[in-house]
Amino acid sequence: MMGEKISVIVPVYNVEAYLEKCVESILKQTYTNLEILLVNDGSTDSSGELCDQLAQRDQRIRVIHKENGGLSDARNRGIEEASSDLIGFIDSDDYIDEDMYETLYRQMLESNADLSMCGHYDVYHQIPEKQVAAIQTWELTPQEAIKMVMEAKILSVTAVNKLYKKELFEHLRFEIGKIAEDAFIMIALIHHCRKVVATNEKKYYYVHRENSITTQKFSLKFLNVIEAYEQNATIIRENYPELADVATMRLNWAYFYVLDRLLVDADFKDKVLEDRLIAYLKKNTKNILLDSRFTRARKVSFLALCLSRKLYTKILLAQTKR
C-alpha cells in the first residue's frame, strides 16, 4: 500500500541485542512509504554503529546521533527532524506486525481521523499474549477516546501503537527528564483531535524485560506517575466534566502504583511519603470501593491496608510472587 509518507521515530539507547529485530519489523511493513528515523541517544554500547550499518541496508533509514537526553528528548528530536505529516513511534526493544502501519493508515484515511490506534501484545519471556477474540473498530470523539484510554481495558496511554497527524505536536512535546512520559502527553494529544479511530486488534509487541515489581528499586521518579495523572485530571475536569469519575479512578490507580512499589522495596524507606500516599487513598475509600473498574482483589487488599500496612505489604508480596 502506498499513501502519504509516515515518519517512524525509533529512539535508540543501549539496545544492541534488540535493535535489529525492531528495525527489521519496520522494513517488512506492507505500507512502504516510510521514513525511519533512528535517534541514537548517546548509546555507550554498539547501538550507534548498528544504526549506521542498518542505514546502509535501506535508503528509508536516517540516523541521528545526539548526546544522551532520555527517551522523551530523543522522541522530540525525531518530531523536529520528521519530513512527513504523519508520525509514529516505536521503542527500540519492541517490534510490530508487518501490516501495522497499513492498518493504522487505512483506518485513519477512511474515518478522516487525526489519531489512529491499535491494540498491543504484552510480551513476557518472549511469549506474547493472545490476539483478541472479536476484532472491532471504533470512530471516537475526543471524550470517548479519553474515556477508553483512561480505563485502559481496550486502549492504552502508550505512545507507540499509534499513528498521529504531525500537527497535533505543534504545541506539544514529550516531558523531558520524567518517567511516564506517555501519560504526560496522551490525554492532551487526544484533546486536540477532532476525531480518533481505534481498533482492538493487536499489532504492536510491547516487550517487558522485567516481569515483577519486586525487581524494581523504588525511586522518587515514580512520583511522576501521580503528577501525570493529576495533570490529566485537570484537563478532564475542565473540558470533560462527565468523565470526572474516570479521572478520579486513574488518579487513585496512580497512588496505588507508587505505594506498591515503595512498600515492596525493602531497601527504600520513607515513612512520610508512605503516610501521604495512604492518607490520600483512605480519603478516597468510597470512590475505590464503589468503582467497578477496581478488581475485587484490589478492594480486598485496600481494606487490608486500612487495617495494617504490614498486612497489605504481605498480601502485595504474595501476589507478585505468583
Where are these regions (language model features)?
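N-proximal low-complexity "stem/linker" segments adjacent to membrane-targeting elements
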Residues: M1-L27
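Acidic helix N-cap motif at the loop->helix transition within catalytic regions
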Residues: E20, L34, D45-L54, R77, ...
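A conserved acidic beta->alpha catalytic loop
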Residues: S25, T32, N40-E49, E67
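Glycine-rich, basic loop-to-helix element that forms the pyrophosphate-binding segment
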Residues: K66-A82, S92
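Donor-binding/catalytic cores of nucleotide-activated saccharide
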Residues: L71, S92-V197, V207, N211-L220
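Short aromatic/hydrophobic "clamp" motif used to bind/position activated sugar donors
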Residues: I87
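Catalytic core of nucleotide-sugar-dependent glycosyltransferases
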Residues: K203-R209, Q216-L243, Y257-N287
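Membrane-interface aromatic/basic loop that binds lipid-linked glycans or pyrophosphate carriers
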Residues: V264-R322
